[in-house]
Each structure stands twice: as structure tokens, then as C-alpha cells.
UniProtKB/Swiss-Prot annotation:
Resulting phenotype, residue 157 to S: In sporadic cancer; somatic mutation; impairs heterotrimeric complex assembly with STRADA and CAB39
Reported effect, residue 181 to E: In sporadic cancer; somatic mutation; impairs heterotrimeric complex assembly with STRADA and CAB39; requires 2 nucleotide substitutions
Effect of residue 174 to R: In sporadic cancer; somatic mutation; impairs heterotrimeric complex assembly with STRADA and CAB39
Phenotype for residue 285 to Q: In sporadic cancer; somatic mutation; impairs heterotrimeric complex assembly with STRADA and CAB39
Organism: Homo sapiens (Human)
Protein name listed in UniProt: Serine/threonine-protein kinase STK11
Family indicated by similarity: Belongs to the protein kinase superfamily. CAMK Ser/Thr protein kinase family. LKB1 subfamily.
Domain Protein kinase: 49-309
Cellular component terms per the entry's GO annotation: centrosome; cilium; cytoplasm; cytosol; extracellular exosome; intracellular protein-containing complex; membrane; mitochondrion
Lipid-conjugated positions (S-palmitoyl cysteine): 418
Length: 433
């Protein structure tokens, strides 16, 4: 084909351009004929944790799935940006308080904090938690009735009371019990989460009196709706648990309003109706937990002794299953770290194939690490110290990083047969305790 000078094309009309061969290198194709290559998922490591896909996002930050490269346990990490926390009232204080509380709590029905990582340079905090497959609110939203069968609701409620009793025994008032803060594992274990607005009572406090509340409006008791200066913290949790039980068994809320002012007005009056299909035992329990006067409201001991709580409820309806993943529609909620794991395991070791967030990740503290002497050669063979940054567990980050890069360049065919977990650990520049 004859090559045409581009400067001469402006002298031709459209018809003349076609005659000189423009149609031979300008093609129009339908979008259905285009085959897009999927974007390669680059592996990203935060300390010893391999990052997966997004699980959810809230006002405080994002939650992603991660894999512990040492234990191969599935975890969830809450990623918090200090810049964003400053824009939220009491944001930083709530996060630090939640970390302090979770560090000393150990119960099967309370979410466990596994690790805390802090990135000084990017001003990011990573709260590594045990993995929960789904939230209770997500399960309720997945069915038209917006409720659980009585047998399933009873099982979840009993676990909620177990976890709540443990928190109260530790002198902690949750203040925000609701389905949105109750998570579930694949085995059906309920976990109380989000202790950001919780309050730890003084060890020598005479009672459970509280003065502040930041919980969700629909789950607040009349004493808070009416603006009382002080109130019983434990009875606030009992009320919120009662509203939660009402919601998961009926699909409704005892109090509603077009806006928060109308909602608080209705809560302050204390008038509500219980659907007739709840039955006398459940209705009596709800009335005891939603008692207007805090002094007359049920205690956890009274809830445990109630006939509806103690009764064994046979399954009359099919239980609400864990819904498919909202993004991938995966009904099994498979591990989202698998594509990243395959990338590390299947590809040659190259620095361009993975990302390490930083050479140094500070753990379990908000301060910069200490310094240790770096050896410097002298005339008599002895070495003197220069400062060298280290990880919180004493690992020399720069030395590990250099060693990792040197190993990656060394030709050794046997290394390709290593397991995925050992490869992740070798790529991680800074081991965590």
C-alpha cells in the first residue's frame, strides 16, 4: 500500500481520502468484538498479612480480608486513616479506646483483636480482627420478611446475652447493641463488635452510672431520649438488646419516626405494640426488656430465667442462610486472597510482582521504634555504632529488605517449588510478632 504524507491529507475531501486508502487503516468495530484482558491483581503485604478484597466500608474506614502468612488464618483488617478520623467527632479517641478494650477481652461471643499495625509515614492504622463471614443486618436484609425464624432468632439472642453478660462482668457498657454490630462466623457463632462508643466503668465505681451516649437513635432507651444527665449503663444495653430481639423476630421496630426528633419523642413516651403472632412468652420477655422505668427493666439474670429464653424451640421454618457475597455473588464466600496468593505462588519472584506497604510497620504502639547501633568497621576489626531503624520486634528492616532482594536475584530452581506461605513470609520485609 502506498504511504501517504499526513501533511497532504488536509487537502483532500472525505471521498478523496477514502480513495487514497484511509479506509485501510481506520476501522470501526462493535464493542462486543473487544476482548478485555482482566487487570492483574497485584499482591500487597502489610507486615506478614497478605491483603485481599474489600469486605465493607463504614464511617471510620474500610475493612478488607487478609491472610496471615505465618498461621494461614483468615483475618479481617480495619484500615483507618488518621486524616479521616480527625474529621469525625471523637474519632481518634474512640478508636484508641476500642483498641484498649479489645486487647483485654477474651470471649467467644466478643470479636477478638489479633494485631494492631501502624504506618507512621502514611498515617494509617490497621486493626487486624478475627474473620466473620457476614453481619446479622446483612442476613436480615437478604430476606423479604426482614426477620429470622424463632428457632434461629433464639439461638442468636442467647449468644448475644452470653457476650453481653461477659462485657458487663468486665465493667464495660457497649451502648450500641444492634444487628449491624453483631457479626457471624461460618459456624454460626455470634460476635459482638464495634466497641468504639463503649465505656469502661471505673474499677471502684459504686454502680453503672453513665453520662454520655453515642449509640444508634432507634435503639436508645427513654432515659436517653428524654435527655437525662445520668442513667444506668447496663440497663441501656438491656433495652438495646430488647429492641434487637423485637427486630429479628418481627422484622419491625418498636419505635419509629420520620426524623430523629419524632423518633425520640415516640421513644420518650414509651408506647409501642407487640405483634400478636409473637406469642405470650416472647411478648412477656419483650415487655420486661423494654420496660420504661430502668429500675423495673429486666436484668440479665431475669432474662436467663425467663421461660422463652430457657425453652427449646424446634425449627418450624427453614433458617435464613448466609447470603452470597454482594460484589462477586459467591454463595460460598470464598477467600478473596486466592488470586493474590496464586500471583505470588505461580509467578517468578520479581520485585515488580508484589507490593510491600512499607519497609517498617510499627505494631502494638503509636510511637516510632527505637534505634540500635549499626556496626561500623574500624582499624582493629571492631565496629562502632551508628543508628539503624528496627521493627518493634527488633528485626532490622533494611537488612531483611536487602537480603530479600538478593535472594530474589539468585538463580535457584529449587526455590520455585516452595509453598505459597513460605514465599509470602520471604517477601515480607518486616516480620511481626
Amino acid at each position: 500500500m502506498e504511504v501517504v504524507d499526513p501533511q497532504q491529507l488536509g487537502m483532500f475531501t472525505e471521498g478523496e481520502l477514502m480513495s487514497v486508502g484511509m479506509d485501510t487503516f481506520i476501522h470501526r468495530i462493535d464493542s462486543t468484538e473487544v476482548i478485555y484482558q482482566p487487570r492483574r491483581k497485584r499482591a500487597k503485604l502489610i507486615g506478614k498479612y497478605l491483603m485481599g478484597d474489600l469486605l465493607g466500608e463504614g464511617s471510620y474506614g474500610k475493612v478488607k480480608e487478609v491472610l496471615d502468612s505465618e498461621t494461614l488464618c483468615r483475618r479481617a483488617v480495619k484500615i483507618l486513616k488518621k486524616k479521616k478520623l480527625r474529621r469525625i467527632p471523637n474519632g481518634e479517641a474512640n478508636v484508641k479506646k476500642e483498641i484498649q478494650l479489645l486487647r483485654r477481652l477474651r470471649h467467644k461471643n466478643v470479636i477478638q483483636l489479633v494485631d494492631v499495625l501502624y504506618n507512621e509515614e502514611k498515617q494509617k492504622m490497621y486493626m487486624v480482627m478475627e474473620y466473620c463471614v457476614c453481619g446479622m443486618q446483612e442476613m436480615l436484609d437478604s430476606v423479604p420478611e426482614k426477620r429470622f425464624p424463632v428457632c434461629q432468632a433464639h439461638g442468636y439472642f442467647c449468644q448475644l446475652i452470653d457476650g453481653l453478660e461477659y462485657l458487663h462482668s468486665q465493667g464495660i457498657v457497649h451502648k450500641d447493641i444492634k444487628p449491624g454490630n453483631l457479626l457471624l462466623t461460618t459456624g454460626g457463632t455470634l460476635k459482638i463488635s464495634d466497641l468504639g462508643v463503649a465505656e469502661a466503668l471505673h474499677p471502684f465505681a459504686a454502680d453503672d452510672t453513665c453520662r454520655t451516649s453515642q449509640g444508634s437513635p432507634a435503639f436508645q432507651p427513654p432515659e436517653i431520649a428524654n435527655g437525662l444527665d445520668t442513667f444506668s449503663g447496663f440497663k441501656v444495653d438491656i433495652w438495646s438488646a430488647g429492641v434487637t430481639l423485637y427486630n429479628i423476630t418481627t422484622g419491625l421496630y418498636p419505635f419509629e419516626g420520620d426524623n430523629i426528633y419524632k423518633l425520640f419523642e415516640n421513644i420518650g413516651k414509651g408506647s409501642y405494640a407487640i405483634p400478636g403472632d409473637c406469642g405470650p412468652p416472647l411478648s412477656d420477655l419483650l415487655k420486661g426488656m423494654l420496660e420504661y422505668e430502668p429500675a423495673k427493666r429486666f436484668s440479665i439474670r431475669q432474662i436467663r430465667q425467663h421461660s422463652w429464653f430457657r425453652k427449646k424451640h424446634p425449627p418450624a421454618e427453614a433458617p435464613v442462610p448466609i447470603p452470597p457475597s454482594p460484589d462477586t455473588k459467591d454463595r460460598w464466600r470464598s477467600m478473596t486472597v486466592v488470586p493474590y496468593l496464586e500471583d505470588l505462588h505461580g509467578a517468578d519472584e520479581d520485585e515488580d510482582l508484589f507490593d510491600i506497604e512499607d519497609d517498617i510497620i510499627y505494631t502494638q504502639d503509636f510511637t516510632v521504634p527505637g534505634q540500635v547501633p549499626e556496626e561500623e568497621a574500624s582499624h582493629n576489626g571492631q565496629r562502632r555504632g551508628l543508628p539503624k531503624a528496627v521493627c518493634m520486634n527488633g528485626t532490622e528492616a533494611a537488612q531483611l529488605s536487602t537480603k530479600s532482594r538478593a535472594e530474589g536475584r539468585a538463580p535457584n530452581p529449587a526455590r520455585k517449588a516452595c509453598s505459597a506461605s513460605s514465599k509470602i513470609r520471604r517477601l515480607s520485609a518486616c516480620k511481626q510478632q
